[in-house]
């Protein structure tokens, strides 16, 4: 077997595995984030999705206010976690599951999760805390989806 064929075969198998995983695995971390938002944020997830330049998919430019800045920090947090604590995973960190619960009004990340899950949970906890701390700055005109 030629080295080129072997390399091609390995790349093809890896690509197929990644595609299958993306199609059939639910985005668990996103589901956790949605659940956390529904449970602990002062506003509904729909009020944040499409808000400013960073809330929702992607993000670029300058945040329009403190709520949008929360989303920019969250995007950066996921990027850092993807490179560090979750770097051993082939898949996107948005597919990684973690456990959390509420203690009164406080979000608590499960210390039994691995470093990756704990770090992702902290990113999500921090954005919910940031949303709630900056709720007075929320401006519906900045929401491209429902505004």
UniProtKB/Swiss-Prot annotation:
<dbReference type="InterPro" id="IPR001211">
    <property type="entry name" value="PLipase_A2"/>
</dbReference>
<feature type="propeptide">
    <location>
        <begin position="20"/>
        <end position="28"/>
    </location>
</feature>
<feature type="binding site">
    <location>
        <position position="56"/>
    </location>
    <ligand>
        <name>Ca(2+)</name>
    </ligand>
</feature>
<feature type="disulfide bond">
    <location>
        <begin position="86"/>
        <end position="116"/>
    </location>
</feature>
<keyword id="KW-0443">Lipid metabolism</keyword>
<comment type="function">
    <text>PLA2 catalyzes the calcium-dependent hydrolysis of the 2-acyl groups in 3-sn-phosphoglycerides.</text>
</comment>
<keyword id="KW-0732">Signal</keyword>
<feature type="active site">
    <location>
        <position position="74"/>
    </location>
</feature>
<dbReference type="GO" id="GO:0005509">
    <property type="term" value="F:calcium ion binding"/>
</dbReference>
<dbReference type="InterPro" id="IPR036444">
    <property type="entry name" value="PLipase_A2_dom_sf"/>
</dbReference>
<dbReference type="InterPro" id="IPR033112">
    <property type="entry name" value="PLipase_A2_Asp_AS"/>
</dbReference>
<keyword id="KW-0378">Hydrolase</keyword>
<feature type="active site">
    <location>
        <position position="124"/>
    </location>
</feature>
<feature type="binding site">
    <location>
        <position position="75"/>
    </location>
    <ligand>
        <name>Ca(2+)</name>
    </ligand>
</feature>
<keyword id="KW-0106">Calcium</keyword>
<protein>
    <recommendedName>
        <fullName>Phospholipase A2 SSD387</fullName>
        <ecNumber>3.1.1.4</ecNumber>
    </recommendedName>
</protein>
<dbReference type="InterPro" id="IPR033113">
    <property type="entry name" value="PLipase_A2_His_AS"/>
</dbReference>
<keyword id="KW-1015">Disulfide bond</keyword>
<dbReference type="GO" id="GO:0016042">
    <property type="term" value="P:lipid catabolic process"/>
</dbReference>
<dbReference type="GO" id="GO:0004623">
    <property type="term" value="F:phospholipase A2 activity"/>
</dbReference>
<dbReference type="GO" id="GO:0006644">
    <property type="term" value="P:phospholipid metabolic process"/>
</dbReference>
<keyword id="KW-0442">Lipid degradation</keyword>
<dbReference type="InterPro" id="IPR016090">
    <property type="entry name" value="PLipase_A2_dom"/>
</dbReference>
<dbReference type="Pfam" id="PF00068">
    <property type="entry name" value="Phospholip_A2_1"/>
</dbReference>
<dbReference type="GO" id="GO:0005576">
    <property type="term" value="C:extracellular region"/>
</dbReference>
<keyword id="KW-0964">Secreted</keyword>
<feature type="disulfide bond">
    <location>
        <begin position="77"/>
        <end position="123"/>
    </location>
</feature>
<feature type="disulfide bond">
    <location>
        <begin position="109"/>
        <end position="121"/>
    </location>
</feature>
<feature type="disulfide bond">
    <location>
        <begin position="70"/>
        <end position="130"/>
    </location>
</feature>
<comment type="similarity">
    <text>Belongs to the phospholipase A2 family.</text>
</comment>
<feature type="signal peptide">
    <location>
        <begin position="1"/>
        <end position="19"/>
    </location>
</feature>
<keyword id="KW-0479">Metal-binding</keyword>
<dbReference type="GO" id="GO:0050482">
    <property type="term" value="P:arachidonate secretion"/>
</dbReference>
<feature type="disulfide bond">
    <location>
        <begin position="55"/>
        <end position="71"/>
    </location>
</feature>
<feature type="binding site">
    <location>
        <position position="58"/>
    </location>
    <ligand>
        <name>Ca(2+)</name>
    </ligand>
</feature>
């Amino acid at each position: 077997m030629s080295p080129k064929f072997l390399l091609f075969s390995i790349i093809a198998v890896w690509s197929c595995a990644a595609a299958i995983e993306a199609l059939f695995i639910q985005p668990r971390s996103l589901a956790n984030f949605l659940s956390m938002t529904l449970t602990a944020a002062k506003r509904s997830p729909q009020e944040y999705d499409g808000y400013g330049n960073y809330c929702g998919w992607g993000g670029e430019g300058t945040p329009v206010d403190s709520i949008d800045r929360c989303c920019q920090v969250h995007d950066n947090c996921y990027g850092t976690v993807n490179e560090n604590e979750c770097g051993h995973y082939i898949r996107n960190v948005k597919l990684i599951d973690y456990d959390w619960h509420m203690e009164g009004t406080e979000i608590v990340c499960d210390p039994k999760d691995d470093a990756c899950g704990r770090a992702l949970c902290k990113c999500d906890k921090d954005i919910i805390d940031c949303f709630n701390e900056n709720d007075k700055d929320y401006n519906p005109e900045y929401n491209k989806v429902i505004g």
